[in-house]
Swiss-Prot record:
Species annotation: Xylella fastidiosa (strain Temecula1 / ATCC 700964)
Subunit note: Homodimer.
Enzyme class: ligase
Function: Catalyzes the attachment of proline to tRNA(Pro) in a two-step reaction: proline is first activated by ATP to form Pro-AMP and then transferred to the acceptor end of tRNA(Pro). As ProRS can inadvertently accommodate and process non-cognate amino acids such as alanine and cysteine, to avoid such errors it has two additional distinct editing activities against alanine. One activity is designated as 'pretransfer' editing and involves the tRNA(Pro)-independent hydrolysis of activated Ala-AMP.
Entry protein name: Proline--tRNA ligase
Main subcellular localisation: cytoplasm
Gene Ontology biological process terms from the UniProt entry: prolyl-tRNA aminoacylation
Amino acid sequence: MRLSEFHLHTTKEIPADAELVSHRLMLRAGMIRKLASGLYTWSPLGLRVLRKVEAIVRDEMNRAGAVEMLLPTIQPRELWEESERWEKFGSQLLKIKDRKQAEYCYSPTAEEAVTDYVRQELTSYKQLPVNLYQIQTKFRDEIRPRFGVMRAREFVMKDAYSFHLNDADLVREYENMRATYTRIFTRLGLEFRAVQADSGAIGGDASQEFHVIADSGEDVLAFSTGSDYAANIEAAIAATPGPRLTANETLQKVSTPTQKRCEDVAALLDIPLQRVVKSIAVMTDSGFFLALLRGDHTLNDIKLSKLPGLANFRLANEVEIARHLGSEPGFLGPVCPGMPIRIIADCEVAVMADFVVGANEVGFHLVGVNWGRDLPEPEVVADIRNVIEGDRAVDGGKICIARGIEVGHVFQLGRKYAEAMKATVLDEYGKAVTMTMGCYGIGVSRIVAAAIEQNHDVAGIIWPAPIAPWQVAVCVINPKKDPVITAAAEMLLAELQSADVDTVLDDRGLRPGVMFADMELIGIPHRIVVSERGLAAGTYEYRARRTAMVENLDKTTLLTRIKA
């Protein structure tokens, strides 16, 4: 490939609405161009990267035994009404009418279409299991498209659907797909974590998300240094605390005139924040509760809502707080002699001793508080907090916190769609059996942006080698000055290509600084400079994009380095 024959248009301009690094760099590198809100044109450069991601995904899906197909993106209303998602999916479902006023949607997922195909094609248990996948353009009518292709309305996705006679076989394929996804993201050269997740609008039972680790990620992840344990912060758990500490202090009321925050109380009293307990007033279907957390912890709404009777909890307002405690936020506490308060204590709080709480009196806190003596044992003890960096993990390791970008999701759907759409086969006894399903998605176009979020510097993109547009850029200095320089570059290009090294020759005749800046911006892993001075010395200048290391190497050493 020669850049003089390739459309490459880089720019230094950054649109004001480009918030993420990946969005800015993809625009600057000329990988994408905005057509309309949430709609992007992929340039030849961008498409090279997208196709490389697709190729790895396709190769591993085929290796795993899945079979590729292609489903229509425009799907009839009747199918989506069978699954009851025509209305339930909400405003993200783009609905259209043809000239006959028949209604369709531009599909964001393809459960209905693939189930319709399978119920027509499969009749016997002998045809199961089957795993069908496609790499196809999808559409979600996002209310606020942003972040470039990270959250575009139109996107490229690999979606796979497996069909099984029973749940045991579904679990087997689910594990097969989990292992396949691990191979895919490993081959893509990305740092990632697989985490337990919620199935969301698609539905189903067990599910797991795959996240690329990046500071700009929308999701907060917790993972252990001791094993492959990882979870979304909402679902992450820490090891159970040890036995309750021994009480040594007497109860005292202290003045905290303006200190409402736990941090301020700890600073005033010159004690660790971990000794302060925050009281969060909540209203439930059965009344008023105080949820108690350590001062350095935060409430996990999802964990709290899963406790019996708390599915519809909400934070109490100031009127309700005053009615039940006679106080105001910032000074609330569970010590209420003669006025029993229902308490939900986080597991960590339940084993504390000599702790500090609000006195239910404006301007005062209580110190030296202990269970059983100053207040009754909590009605409920449960894990209701978010884990934090450094917590002891259930496997004995330490909890680490990072942000992640979701790029893959696997589900055990069960029979949700098959039952709704009457997708059955005959079993060995001739009885009609409803098939059970799995669903496995990868955001192909999103991976491109996520890879950039994880791999970049001030100069531009640093592609993982497997998905770089080219592995090597051969840059020619003053190609018109001496035909020997051009001939040497052409020979090097031919040798690299014959060794199956994806190489581009920058023969545009630009100034070296401009040429080098372009190669750094578009993230080519290896740069080789062919110059008059180098040829005179029998060397080529080599620069590794990731390490920025520059060396002058002879051709034999250079080719060995590139092929390694």
